[in-house]
Amino acid sequence: GASQAAYGEQARQEGLESHAYEFIHTNNPNNLFSMNFDVIIGNPPYQLDDGGNGASAKPLYHLFVEQAMKLKPKYLSMVIPARWYSGGKGLASFRFSMLNDERISKLIDYTSSEDCFPGVDIAGGICYFLWEREYSGQCNYTNNRNGKRNNLIKSLNEYKIFIRYPAADGIIKKITSLNETCMNTIVSTRKPFGLETNVVPSCSGELTLRYNKGTGKYPADKIIVGRDLINKWKVMISYLSSEHAGQPDKSGMFRVLSTMEILPPTHICTETYLLAGWSDSKEEAENILKYLKTKFTRFLIAQIAVSQHITRNCFSFVPLQDFSKAWTDEELYAKYALTKEEIEFIENMIRPMES
């Protein structure tokens, strides 16, 4: 979608009454039409060209969905990005309303947008839904991945976010049933040391700065945030996921995490990176890193990380472990009593990484 200004002064002077953005900016869309709608079908603009790059563009599609619902049609069906399942800028209230709306009778999901729109990469995949005014009940959900369709009748609001893979539901329920503290309680927010992405090293300094082009010196007196972490062994991961636009590789598998390394004491980083843990012990930091590299952990992160961004929220299903020891996938599968089928599902979705 383009901003209204992009349509030009001439178009505005001619009074383009059907301009899409008039529809989403009115409190009562019924006033725009002299008729009632029994059926509304659409593929709305996905984002607003706000003058920045694609990463900063604001989602727009949810506004069309919300306004269309206000028209109270008998049936509403729209094709929209699937990022709303667990992320997206400004989509929290939309996600809550969608997951709690029992009038959504069907939801069809495509992990890869190219299965729906050949040649088109849409971060997090694509979906379409059927909303029925007179319906109230569970949703008939279908996920399409690697040419396979998995169907499940379910309530959409089991969690605060939506789990797209039916096979993952059982795995997550086994893990969450133990009520263990999860890693989202320790993973840093963006800018763990208060440094934006465009910060570069200085000519001199007591610290070593890790930034997107390498490392360099940085003055300690410029660090205000995260000073208590400077002398820790820190586990650093990239804010961007490994997958281009959140899409799987050609084999349909995900690596999930990209750059991962340990920052020793006196090393810091910009907001290009997050800290996934830290310790006074190098060995414990190494064990945290090994845990992050397991397929088990990256699978759980992938259930929330449906786009190209990794945030602390993506670790909400990842249980904390005793990091005085290293963990293997086999030990984790046994600890959480995963079945052979559940293990195969994880193994076939997540690419291996060297430990």
Please name every model-derived segment.
Residues 49, 85-86, 244-246, 353:
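Flexible loop/turn segments at secondary-structure boundaries
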